[in-house]
Regions:
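Central regulatory/effector-binding core of bacterial HTH transcription factors
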Residues: 11-70, 220-226
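Short beta-strand-to-loop elements that line the ligand-binding cleft
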Residues: 42-46, 110, 132-142
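Alpha-helical linker/hinge and terminal dimerization helices associated
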Residues: 1-7
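A ligand-binding cleft/hinge motif common to bilobed small-molecule-binding domains
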Residues: 147-172
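Short beta-strand->loop
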Residues: 74-77, 170-182
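Flexible hinge/capping segments at coil-to-helix
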Residues: 71-82, 86-111, 126
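Ligand-binding cleft/hinge of the Venus flytrap
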Residues: 33, 119-133
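C-terminal effector-binding regulatory domain of bacterial HTH transcription factors
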Residues: 161-166, 170, 180-229
Length: 229
């Protein structure tokens, strides 16, 4: 995919931030961006909190979820969702959940993400929205750690479809309660309008095309592998 040359981006520094659960997804995209636009100087910060774009000098924050303050400008980079999953070994030791309330009695792997309530999974289904309180012996603020624990059979995780799709296809993970999911759309959030900042416009457009190419949209209900019952 080709992009127009951005002469005004020369020797421009662009500071980006992302939640601690997402660096492995964003880092390859920024590497490709750097190859395409060597005149851009990129700084990539990983944060486990919401950043103050103005006071912290951040040009672009990549956020997951649709809850964005109205004073900020946002453009959706990709549609995504999270699914509930566990390893076959875990499901052999524990009765697979048959309804959402069963999660309260099972070990769950909880991620502390920015301003999200800890241990409360906000899920969607065809019937509407649901909130379930979950607990477990292991928790982290890093998605890759929780992903590995899930593969190790330590509990049920709520993970991005992007992260677990290959594990589910290979049988290393099994999707449970597939009628439930959590929206996890990816947004570029910034304070300067794209028309006034060539470096931000170039970065946002590149990331949007990159995610569309590497992470095509996948409907939540189409991702079901098994109900675990």
């Amino acid at each position: 995919m080709s992009f127009p040359t951005c002469a005004r981006c020369r020797r421009e520094r662009c500071v980006l931030s992302v939640a601690s659960a997402w660096p492995s997804v964003v880092a390859p995209a920024l590497s490709a961006l750097a190859l395409q636009y060597p005149q851009l100087e990129l700084r990539f910060d990983v944060q486990d909190r919401l950043v103050d774009l103005v006071n912290e000098g951040v040009d672009l924050d990549i956020r997951v979820g649709d809850d964005i303050a109205p004073n900020l400008i946002a453009r959706q980079l990709a549609a995504n969702h999270r699914v509930l999953c566990a390893s076959p070994q875990f499901l052999a030791r524990h009765a697979p959940p048959k309804q959402l309330s069963d999660l309260a009695a099972l070990p769950c792997l909880v991620i502390k993400e920015r301003d999200h309530p800890f241990g409360v999974w906000q899920l969607h289904s065809k019937e509407g929205q649901h909130a379930i309180k979950v607990t477990g012996p292991l928790s982290s603020n890093h998605g890759e750690i929780v992903h590995q624990w899930c593969l190790d059979g330590q509990g049920i995780a709520l993970r991005s479809w992007w992260d677990v799709r290959e594990n589910i296809a290979s049988g290393h993970l099994v999707q449970v309660l597939p009628d439930y999911w959590q929206p996890a759309n990816v947004w570029a959030v910034y304070v300067s309008r794209l028309a006034t900042s060539a470096k931000i416009r170039t970065t946002v457009e590149f990331l949007r095309h990159y995610f569309q190419l590497h992470y095509p949209q996948h409907e939540p209900t189409a991702s079901a592998v098994g109900r675990g019952d």
